[in-house]
């Protein structure tokens, strides 16, 4: 039925099986749609957000997917600026992953602000003293850049290639993609950093506050570093998941190994800076606030084990695996390392958002915990459903992996696949 739309020389499953594959993701979108409608019609009282937790599950998801989507700008930087041409075998996938992450985050923010029809106030009545203003501008601009980078991939569709104007336009866009890659690096550096800097300047909350390096708190640089360390691992996970489901080889091992190696060394470098920053915080910010480390975890469900889990289990262990060639060449160890790395960055964002707000700032105040409502989970999980749908449709109808045909030439007649 849709054979004319499928890339030439590759096999895809039947439309019926593909539709069956999309049903759970459509279900998540439906859940999210009902949740969003309730939040827009009845207000944010549908959530458990309050004056204590002005930031909650949605912001954790936002910061996590924005960090995991950093594989798009960083891989673009390596491919078009540094000249790692072997990464062209995976660059299309990273662009789509980045687009999914950023568009999903922006959609979630549209509900989070409570009155999305006033979202333009962020730009028209900009608070130039707020890091969130810079974040809003850069995220919106970078989403536009990702849309432009996604466009030539769409125009490579087999049917669209028959239209001469589309074919030439897409071809010309490819020639200037380095300009958009450089623009994306610039925009991403500042909004990734400002998301961290926003917490570093919360001086009334010693758990998050950090010393400044020139005009930026150290969290500015740590958020950038952690994003570029985890982003490539998320790209690897998405690629390996697609290979497992489609039962095809989609990307050469050399490309995956290069990304894993770079990610491992970046993660190790980030951990060195993170540990130095944490020790400086323990010796400086904490005692200057009249506190000790144990005071932050005196009560409540959030313990020091979260920091141990983030730095040791989800930091040092995957860094070691990714830096050792024999370890990362084992697919099971590679996937474990990438999972731990991505989990670590989610934990990092959770610690800075939820744990920071759960710790009282007054000696007579209590410790808090946060439990999201089903509406909050619905909107957050809808982003996952949206991402799975868009990536599945892109894989089915676009040449997402340029060497798929070459890598599977001998196996074109086998296997069932949901795409």
Model-inferred region functions:
Residues 102-117, 183-189, 268-270, 346-361, ...:
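Hydrophobic alpha-helical transmembrane segments of integral membrane proteins
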Residues 76-77, 149-150, 319-322, 390-395:
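Alpha-helical transmembrane segments
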Residues 34, 50, 63-66, 92-99, ...:
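Secondary-structure capping and boundary motifs in well-ordered enzyme cores
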Residues 1-71, 75-78, 359, 388, ...:
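N-terminal signal-anchor module of multipass membrane proteins
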Residues 39-58, 64-162, 177-196:
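Transmembrane-helix bundle segments that line or gate the permeation/cavity pathway
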Residues 42-46, 117-121, 202-206, 283-291, ...:
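Peri-membrane helix termini and adjoining interfacial loops of integral membrane proteins
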Residues 8-10, 15-16, 22-36, 84-86, ...:
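Long, contiguous internal "core" modules enriched in hydrophobic/ aromatic residues
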Residues 330-419:
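TerminUS-proximal long segments
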